[in-house]
Amino acid sequence: MARTTYKETALDEGDQLEIVHFIGGGDRSDPQPADDPFTVAGRVFSSRLLVGTGKYRDFEETARAIEASGAEIVTVAVRRVNVSDPSQPMLVDYVDPAKYTYLPNTAGCFTADEAVRTLRLAREAGGWSLVKLEVLGDQRTLYPNMAETFLAAEALIRDGFEVMVYCADDPIAAKRLEDMGCVAIMPLGSLIGSGLGIINPYTIRLIKESVSVPVLVDAGVGTASDAAVAMELGCDGVLMNTAIAQAKDPVRMARAMRLAIEAGRLSYQAGRMPRKLYADPSSPLAGLI
């Protein structure tokens, strides 16, 4: 139901009412240089690091880690409100939607219908049209179900959503999603929460070369060097959650990730030296004593 129709809509016998809010799912100082902004769906950001809000010990730690990361976009999951205990803390009390861009996601959805319904609820609850779509294949791998992802993306785009999409590291699928109208392609580096890093850097690079919309590595980052590798491959950004939230010191790891993203981006822009089979001395031989 659209918010604009609330006043004139009456509940009938047997109707069910769902009240939802946003939960953790998935330092604004020292951002990326102003001359190298990250742009998605016409929105401009300083930071190329996107962070999830789940798996932390509490909301206080969540807020401190996000602040240290420098991220401006935070992913949130949509869940039913516990109306029996309204005193329970809520994410919005700690992570201000006026300060950060909330990116509602479909974490936990295994069908296109579930994903579409979840994001429609998110739009009604918060008014957000920029969303992250993920349709999972099974509980064991949380690998993307691409058939259902295509169906959900088509329905959401038709409904006016701007879709950032979690997908397999498949350049053909990525191109199809771009052609459908997705505003960002988000291939997994490795399985969600695995910390295995980027298993197939070659296919990530192929995806980057195949599409013109932003490409962000989503899932699998375990430590700062993984984030730097993603950026050195030419990716436009990285989304992560577990690597920060499950670190021994999440706030310190968040800062490490911020620096890794910046270092990887600068390295990509600078261009690495060519690989050589044999040695090449740094000091000139002319004038050797």
Curated annotation (Swiss-Prot):
1-deoxy-D-xylulose 5-phosphate binds at residues 193, 219-220, 241-242. CDD domains: ThiG. It catalyses: [ThiS sulfur-carrier protein]-C-terminal-Gly-aminoethanethioate + 2-iminoacetate + 1-deoxy-D-xylulose 5-phosphate = [ThiS sulfur-carrier protein]-C-terminal Gly-Gly + 2-[(2R,5Z)-2-carboxy-4-methylthiazol-5(2H)-ylidene]ethyl phosphate + 2 H2O + H(+). Keywords: Cytoplasm, Schiff base, Thiamine biosynthesis, Transferase. One of its GO terms (cellular component) is cytoplasm. The active site is at 132 (schiff-base intermediate with dxp). GO terms for biological process: thiamine diphosphate biosynthetic process. Signal peptide: none annotated. Homotetramer. Forms heterodimers with either ThiH or ThiS. HAMAP family: ThiG. This is Thiazole synthase. It comes from Rhodospirillum rubrum (strain ATCC 11170 / ATH 1.1.1 / DSM 467 / LMG 4362 / NCIMB 8255 / S1).
